[in-house]
């Protein structure tokens, strides 16, 4: 995705409308902000923004109103979109392109989508829309057909763990490799969730290893989850209920325990069907 967008910016062939789709925390909004800086950068480098010119700095700190981020979840009415449309016809004051980043665009009402469609059909040369959504099926086909679509996939646990270790080093957080590995699995492909979990664990203080993560987040851990799975597989209802009660009495998050159980089942199935592959 980034290579394609870089090439478009470098060659001056950007679209007037983009649609970024994918699960939460995969970088859609972050990428949209970088793209907004790149198309307005005064000294771009192979499609990347320099992040030092007045345009890049102004967009980053939010002082340039020509680049606006709108949360459709709280601004989903037709009046807000019409106001945006009326403003969009004017040339930008400080940058080359006026960019509107509309997050959670699927939350717009039907009249709001219709109002948005009108400007997507005949956009001014100076205008760019970047729409982001976690629920693509809720976006009307008329909107989809007028956007370049990019699908953001879940980030691999290895990449999340590497990023968490980097951030921990920058923030002087004592994060161990096993702690980063566990956090990366709990993040479920969303780097933002991984960073939030790291902050939560670091707030407790001390070394953030796998044991500290389990304690801070109220998780059962591999051993207790495996024991629960053994009771289930052996059809020992009493043992399973006693194990669950023990976890509950130990202030473990039952919902999280069920999530761990689901992950364990997935890993077991993967090992059974593809023993040479990785889970």
Residue ranges and their predicted role:
Residues 54, 58-65, 80-83, 96, ...:
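Extended, largely alpha-helical regulatory/partner-binding modules appended to the mid-to-C-terminal parts
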Residues 1-149:
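P-loop/Walker A NTP-binding region and its immediately flanking N-terminal helices
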């Amino acid at each position: 995705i980034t290579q394609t967008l870089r090439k478009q910016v470098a060659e001056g062939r950007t679209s007037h409308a983009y649609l970024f789709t994918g699960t939460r925390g995969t970088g859609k909004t972050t990428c949209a902000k970088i793209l907004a800086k790149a198309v307005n950068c005064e000294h771009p480098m192979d499609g990347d923004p320099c992040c030092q010119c007045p345009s890049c700095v102004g967009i980053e700190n939010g002082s340039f109103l020509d680049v606006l981020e709108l949360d459709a979840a709280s601004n989903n009415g037709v009046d807000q979109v019409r106001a945006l449309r009326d403003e969009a016809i004017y040339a930008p004051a400080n940058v080359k392109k006026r960019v509107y980043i509309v997050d959670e665009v699927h939350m717009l009402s039907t009249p709001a989508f219709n109002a948005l469609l009108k400007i997507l059909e005949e956009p001014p040369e100076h205008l760019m829309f970047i729409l982001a959504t976690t629920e693509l099926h809720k976006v009307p086909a008329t909107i989809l057909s007028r956007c370049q679509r990019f699908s953001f996939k879940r980030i691999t646990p290895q990449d999340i763990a590497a990023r968490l270790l980097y951030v921990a080093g920058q923030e002087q957080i004592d994060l161990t490799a096993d702690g980063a590995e566990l956090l990366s699995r709990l993040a479920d492909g969303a780097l933002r969730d991984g960073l939030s979990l790291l902050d939560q664990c670091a707030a407790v203080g001390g070394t953030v290893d796998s044991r500290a993560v389990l304690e801070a987040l109220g998780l059962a851990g591999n051993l207790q989850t495996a024991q629960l799975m053994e009771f289930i597989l052996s059809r020992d209802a009493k043992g399973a209920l006693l194990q669950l009660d023990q976890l509950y009495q130990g202030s473990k998050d039952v919902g999280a325990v069920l999530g761990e159980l689901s992950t364990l089942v997935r890993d077991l199935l993967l090992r059974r069907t593809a023993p040479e592959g990785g889970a």
